[in-house]
Amino acid sequence: MKINEIKDLLQADSIDPAILAELAKDDRKGVQKLLVSYQRRQEKLAKQKEEFLGRFSYEKDFWAKGQLVGGVDEVGRGPLAGPVVAAAVILPEDFSLLEVNDSKKLSPQKRLALYPKILQEAVAVGVGVMDNKVIDQINIYEADRLAMKQAVEALSTRPDALLVDAMNVPVDLPQLELIKGDAKSNSIAAASIVAKVFRDSLMDDYARLYPDYAFDHNAGYGTKDHLEALRKYGPTPIHRLTFSPVSEMVGLKKAD
């Protein structure tokens, strides 16, 4: 077999052990190099599977009782502009998207690739959005909780319990609050991906409305370019007027 053919063969995730044994006898350096690369990839995949299954430990407690459990997370607490977005996701027991993890650990491209797959494979997905005006009226913490409540209530199937990333959702359901839950639960991780992609899409839309602020790049966070635009043009209708330094800028404009 030619080395290029062997290279193509070893791209598969699972290969007949008999074939691997035969290739191990091949003394060509190129073949042995390909085998080493294959083994490393298999070890990485095995570790990924082990970690993925480990992030279902909380869900399994509920599944063992025949219960549906939803993961809840939010994104957009820290930006100076735009809404806070929450998502609630109920995953099936046979969910197997190994790359699902805390959205902060994934590239934008990976999140975008996983987003439609999560929507397709989940039992139910709900999204909640609280805009900057609500945030200014009731504070970011309470707006977070309302967005999470809205997300849970938007689920087409009602869960028996919730796994929540470090917060309590104001709904009448048993809840387990997990610190850094998006790194401990696949359900919360899936929710974090949905919320992040959904919010990023909203900020892309706002970038077209307010091109001077580069919301498609900074997602509303206080980057250098964003702050310079704020100083030059002032706040937009989507800025959080109670957040510093926006609040100080608004105060200065009023004083003028």
UniProtKB/Swiss-Prot annotation:
The EC class name is hydrolase
Protein's cellular compartments: Cytoplasm
Task: Report keywords, A-Z.
Answer: Cytoplasm, Endonuclease, Hydrolase, Manganese, Metal-binding, Nuclease
Q: Does the keyword ATP-binding apply?
A: no
Concerning InterPro entries, the annotation shows: RNase_HII (IPR022898), RNase_HII/HIII (IPR001352), RNase_HII/HIII_dom (IPR024567), RNaseH-like_sf (IPR012337), RNaseH_sf (IPR036397)
- Protein's UniProt keywords contain Manganese: yes
- Give a single Pfam family match: RNase_HII
**Where does this chain mainly localize?**
cytoplasm
Enumerate the cofactors the protein uses: Mn(2+); Mg(2+)
Q: What is its EC number?
A: 3.1.26.4
Q: Might you name a Gene Ontology BP term for this protein? A: mismatch repair
Domain of life assignment:
Bacteria
Q: What does this protein do?
A: Endonuclease that specifically degrades the RNA of RNA-DNA hybrids.
The entry's protein name is Ribonuclease HII
Source organism: Lactobacillus delbrueckii subsp. bulgaricus (strain ATCC 11842 / DSM 20081 / BCRC 10696 / JCM 1002 / NBRC 13953 / NCIMB 11778 / NCTC 12712 / WDCM 00102 / Lb 14)
Q: Which gene codes for it?
A: rnhB
